[in-house]
């Protein structure tokens, strides 16, 4: 996908809270992706970008009651809607960066969202290598093996695997 010949990897925190409400946000840097980015930069000549798809700059405070009520309905509806604005944002980010590799961190609560992000990457360019790691793939590796949108599942700490 990258015509300039420079290898590029896009590391993604998939959306989760933003699926409950368009102004909810994960207002922290995805530290695990930061460690991966640092390791990749230190040991390779690849360009690396970290994208937190769960971050909304003008967010509001989360209400727990919303997460389990109307927000949960919204969450499920957005997972089923490929034209939702969050998926357009993910698509645009991948299209603009033009990565050779997309790495997606996944916890069990955001695994469906991570799978959608992986499918979007494959729809853009089937040659993009899609890797997933994090708690969910480490514990539930069979979920990764049963999904064609992932090329590689990383079990445990990913720093050494990503450099390889």
Language-model features, listed with the residues they occupy:
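Generic signal for short, ordered secondary-structure residues
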Residues: 18-19, 72-73, 100
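N-terminal beta-loop-helix "entrance" segment that forms/cooperates
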Residues: 57-73
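Short glycine-rich His-centered loop
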Residues: 6-28
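Basic/polar N-terminal segments that are highly enriched at the extreme N-terminus
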Residues: 1-4
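A broad, low-specificity signal for short, low-complexity segments enriched in glycine/proline
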Residues: 9-12, 62-67, 112-116
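Short, flexible/disordered intra-domain loops and linkers
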Residues: 20-26, 62-66, 78
């Amino acid at each position: 996908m990258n015509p300039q010949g420079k290898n590029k990897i896009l590391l993604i925190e998939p959306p989760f809270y933003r699926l409950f409400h368009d102004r909810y946000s994960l207002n922290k840097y995805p530290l695990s992706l930061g460690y991966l980015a640092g390791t990749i930069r230190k040991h390779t000549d690849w360009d690396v970008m970290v994208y937190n798809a769960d971050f909304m700059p003008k967010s509001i405070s989360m209400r727990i009651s919303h997460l389990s009520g109307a927000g949960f309905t919204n969450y499920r509806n957005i997972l089923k809607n490929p034209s939702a604005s969050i998926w357009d944002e993910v698509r645009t980010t991948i299209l603009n960066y033009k990565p050779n590799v997309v790495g997606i961190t996944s916890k069990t609560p955001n695994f469906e969202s991570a799978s959608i992000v992986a499918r979007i990457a494959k729809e853009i360019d089937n040659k993009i290598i899609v890797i997933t790691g994090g708690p969910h793939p480490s514990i539930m590796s069979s979920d990764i093996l049963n999904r064609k949108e992932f090329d590689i599942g990383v079990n445990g700490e990913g720093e050494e695997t990503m450099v390889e």
